[in-house]
């Protein structure tokens, strides 16, 4: 099933002292080292000759899973988890290959955290590197193989290794090279030097680690360069946890005038940034380089050498290390996402206005059938510009954010709503104010906005100097002006598009891509439906989703149902843990005939369901937040049940469901409102 040629390389890869591997590690030579198959899934099978463990796909069906669970682990120091694996495929399964997922399971959480996923088939072994932040909490590693199409494909694990340290560190003494890879070039590439490897064209150095011919390092030589500006790149594993500090390494350069040795970072969006360049050849010995390195979001480090011709000599690299302590004479650029964000529930946070007079007013509107509330909870505060207290011809309202350090990439997200403007030009715009140059640059302005819908905007920006974000609303004439609402401003490090390429947060569902892990007892016209935009029936249902205003939500279409008919949406089975759970979600109940929305807890092996929360009748034209705190130490499911009311104006919707470990930080008023008819609504099963 597996390519036998892979085994020869693996025997060199696996450590001779496999039995002494640290906790959380296994070379699968004679045992699975405490990693066990979960009985309710397909088994992982240890190869008779050792070397690897695999999933037998010959009898499995597409979509079936094989789950491997580690013993209890603890990472009190920063650790690196490396996985050597292979996914093979057949010609019939190219469109739907098998998949390998790696999760982290904490003892006090009902959901597993997806750390990594891969489904790229390969004819040789591959390596994945994952940074694990230090934590006092115990956890398990869960490895899940999902079968693709065809029964000749395979999923195999050759080694799992968990060691103290950072995945970006490497001395190049092991065959897997710590997950560093060379970007292949026909003429110039990075090679392993030292040991028994010798190059006849250049006099290469001894390695730095052992300072002998027994050690290894990486080098790139110009002897095969055929063109000017030939480039060789050595690419590190992608960082998977935020880190900042001092990145150090040793290097040697021969004939430095004919080559350029540089260090870059590259994020998941493909954006490069040069963070270091060798300014002189250095001496004949190994030279130490220390570089201030910050990876608040996933990125790779790229060691790049550019040659100007075949006489450019060589560049050698060894002993890459990282320390969370910053380099000499360097200080960390302090940035706090919390201090740079605001939902205006308590005050303006670190935002402020022009001294000439307040243009933005912090308001709280009790939502009803005619007025929408804030975006955060539906019942809280937001900012309003062009109110009756500020609106005047030529009025300009400016809201300044806190100072942001320069030379960092930021993602700005906020929600806004526009009411009553005849023209959208300059209704709301965002500027970047460079403090040192007193220059403002417009980076966004509203083009169109449906009335009464909270819309999300997201902007990625980066400036070399310290900056501030400025929200500006302009009222050119009294007759053209309406209201501008602003809420839930967040500023985070990294590109806004980065989140699309990261694993989704555990226990969260926005319904943007699909229904997540929710299922339905019955799926027909009277079921829960995933939708974007307005619902078909007027005077009921939301105009847009809660997440972005233009995304998806789940709802029942009352015109397809009869009075008392119900639809049920079930979560996947959740692990029972000790302590409190907090379930939050947003619900929309607008329409004169609105029925009931209930949330139930169903415990494993119990026929009865416990009611956790309920709302009945028309609530508001707004999305409202619900918080439910509950406890359950047994496996269980959460059920969202919507019941159609007395008329077709009974659409009910939910969005942005989130499960969290621990108690809810705040609890809303649990007073239930009544629409005047029976609570059970003559429930009908269909």
From Swiss-Prot:
Q: Which UniProt keywords apply?
A: Extracellular matrix, Glycoprotein, Repeat, Secreted, Signal
- InterPro entries for this protein: ConA-like_dom_sf, MAM_dom, MAM_domain-containing
How is the polypeptide modified once translated?
O-glycosylated.
Q: Does the keyword Membrane apply?
A: no
Keyword Ubl conjugation attributed: no
Q: Where is the signal peptide?
A: 1-18
Q: Which Gene3D superfamilies match?
A: 2.60.120.200
For the MAM domain, which residue ranges apply?
24-169, 168-329, 340-498, 507-666
Annotated compartments: Secreted, Extracellular space, Extracellular matrix
Please give the GO cellular component terms listed in this UniProt entry: endoplasmic reticulum; extracellular region; membrane
Q: Where is this region: Disordered?
A: 521-543, 665-686
Residues modified by glycosylation: 134, 329, 524
Pfam families, sorted? MAM
In terms of PANTHER family, this protein maps to: APICAL ENDOSOMAL GLYCOPROTEIN PRECURSOR (PTHR23282), MAM DOMAIN-CONTAINING PROTEIN (PTHR23282:SF101)
- Protein name in UniProt: MAM domain-containing protein 2
Q: Which organism is it from?
A: Homo sapiens (Human)
Q: Give the classification, highest ranks.
A: Eukaryota, Metazoa, Chordata, Craniata, Vertebrata
Please state the gene responsible for encoding this protein.
MAMDC2
């Amino acid at each position: 099933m597996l390519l036998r040629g892979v085994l020869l390389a693996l025997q060199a890869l696996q450590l001779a002292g496999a039995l002494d591997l640290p906790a959380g590690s296994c070379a699968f030579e004679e045992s699975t080292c405490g990693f066990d198959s979960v009985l309710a899934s397909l088994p992982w099978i240890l190869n008779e000759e050792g070397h690897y463990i695999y999933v037998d796909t010959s009898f499995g069906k597409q979509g079936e899973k094989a789950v491997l669970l580690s013993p209890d682990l603890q990472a009190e120091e920063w650790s690196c988890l490396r996985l050597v694996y292979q996914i093979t495929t057949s010609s019939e399964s190219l469109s739907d290959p098998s998949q390998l997922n790696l999760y982290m399971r904490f003892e006090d959480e009902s959901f597993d955290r997806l750390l990594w996923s891969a489904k790229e088939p390969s004819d040789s072994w591959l390596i994945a590197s994952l940074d694990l932040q230090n934590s006092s909490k115990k956890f398990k590693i869960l490895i899940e193989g999902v079968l693709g199409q065809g029964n000749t494909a395979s999923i195999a694990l050759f080694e799992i290794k968990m060691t103290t340290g950072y995945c970006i560190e490497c001395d190049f003494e092991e065959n897997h090279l710590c997950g560093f890879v060379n970007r292949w070039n026909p003429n110039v590439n990075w090679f392993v030097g030292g040991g028994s490897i010798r190059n006849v064209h250049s006099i290469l150095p001894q390695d730095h680690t052992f300072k002998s011919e027994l050690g290894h390092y990486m080098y790139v030589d110009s002897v095969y360069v055929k063109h000017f500006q030939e480039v060789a790149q050595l690419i590190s594993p992608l960082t998977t946890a935020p880190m900042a500090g001092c990145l150090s390494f040793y290097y040697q350069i021969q004939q430095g005038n004919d080559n350029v040795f540089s260090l870059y970072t590259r994020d998941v969006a493909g954006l490069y940034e040069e963070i270091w360049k060798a300014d002189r050849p250095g001496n004949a010995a190994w030279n130490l380089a220390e570089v201030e390195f910050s990876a608040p979001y996933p990125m790779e480090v790229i060691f790049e050498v550019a040659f100007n011709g075949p006489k450019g000599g060589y560049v050698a690299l060894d002993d890459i290390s990282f320390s969370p302590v910053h380099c000499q004479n360097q200080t960390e650029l302090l940035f706090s996402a919390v201090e740079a964000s605001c939902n205006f529930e308590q005050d303006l946070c670190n935002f402020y206005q022009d001294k000439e007079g307040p243009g933005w007013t912090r308001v709280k509107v009790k939502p009803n059938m005619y007025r929408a509330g804030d975006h955060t909870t539906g019942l809280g505060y937001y900012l309003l510009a062009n109110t009756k207290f500020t609106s005047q011809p030529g009025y300009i309202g400016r809201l300044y954010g806190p100072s942001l350090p320069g030379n960092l990439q930021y993602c700005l997200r906020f929600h806004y709503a526009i009411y009553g403007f005849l023209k959208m030009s300059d209704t709301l715009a965002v500027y970047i104010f460079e403090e040192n140059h007193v220059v403002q640059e417009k980076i966004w302005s509203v083009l169109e906005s449906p009335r009464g819908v909270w819309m999300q905007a997201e902007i990625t920006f980066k400036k070399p100097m310290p900056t501030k974000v400025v929200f500006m609303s302009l009222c050119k004439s009294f007759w053209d002006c309406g209201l501008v609402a602003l809420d839930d401003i967040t500023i985070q490090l990294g590109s806004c598009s980065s989140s699309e390429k990261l694993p989704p947060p555990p226990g969260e569902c926005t319904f943007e891509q699909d229904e997540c892990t929710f299922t339905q007892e019955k799926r027909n016209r009277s079921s829960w439906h995933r939708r974007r935009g307005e619902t078909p029936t007027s005077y009921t249902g939301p105009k847009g989703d809660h997440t972005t205003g233009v995304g998806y939500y789940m709802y029942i279409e009352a015109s397809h149902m009869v009075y008392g008919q119900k639809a049920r949406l079930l979560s996947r089975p959740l692990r029972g843990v000790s302590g409190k759970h907090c379930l939050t979600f947003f619900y929309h109940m607008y329409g004169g005939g609105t029925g009931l929305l209930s949330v139930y807890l169903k415990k494993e092996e119990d026929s009865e369901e416990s009611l956790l929360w309920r709302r009945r009748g028309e609530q508001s034209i707004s999305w409202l937040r619900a918080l439910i705190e509950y406890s359950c130490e047994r496996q269980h499911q959460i059920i969202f049940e919507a019941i159609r009311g007395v008329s077709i104006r009974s659409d009910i919707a939910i969005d942005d469901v989130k499960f969290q470990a621990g108690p809810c930080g705040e609890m809303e008023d649990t007073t239930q409102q009544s629409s005047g008819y029976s609570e059970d609504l003559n429930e009908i099963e269909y």
